[in-house]
Amino acid sequence: MKTQTALFFFFLFSLMVATQSGVVDTLKNLLMGLLSKRALRNQNFVEYAYDPSLSAADWRALDTLFENY
């Protein structure tokens, strides 16, 4: 009986902390941000990753700069 009471109060306290700190709202907003129509529709951000103006020497220089970063 002591274990059940301790677990009950632990989960009750956890629920109170989660609702007061806004964890549930943060998780909901994160999921909606990842799964919303706008997020699913806006998948063309990868197009900007390729820059044809950079030469092989530029890529090597960038590689050496970020080698120890």
UniProtKB/Swiss-Prot annotation:
Cysteine disulfide links: none
GO CC annotations, alphabetized: extracellular region
Localisation per UniProt entry: Secreted
Keyword DNA damage in annotation: no
Additional record remark: Shows a low ability to inhibit hepatitis C virus (HCV) infection in Huh7.5.1 cells.
Expressed in which tissues: Expressed by the venom gland.
Main location group: secreted
Top-level taxon of origin: Eukaryota
GO biological process: regulation of defense response to virus
Its job: Antimicrobial peptide.
Protein name as annotated: Peptide Ctri9594
Residues annotated as signal peptide: 1-21
Family: Belongs to the non-disulfide-bridged peptide (NDBP) superfamily. Short antimicrobial peptide (group 4) family.
Residue numbers covered by the propeptide annotation in the UniProt entry: 36-69
Keywords linked to the UniProt accession: Antimicrobial, Antiviral protein, Secreted, Signal
Species this protein is from: Chaerilus tricostatus (Scorpion)
Record carries keyword Membrane: no
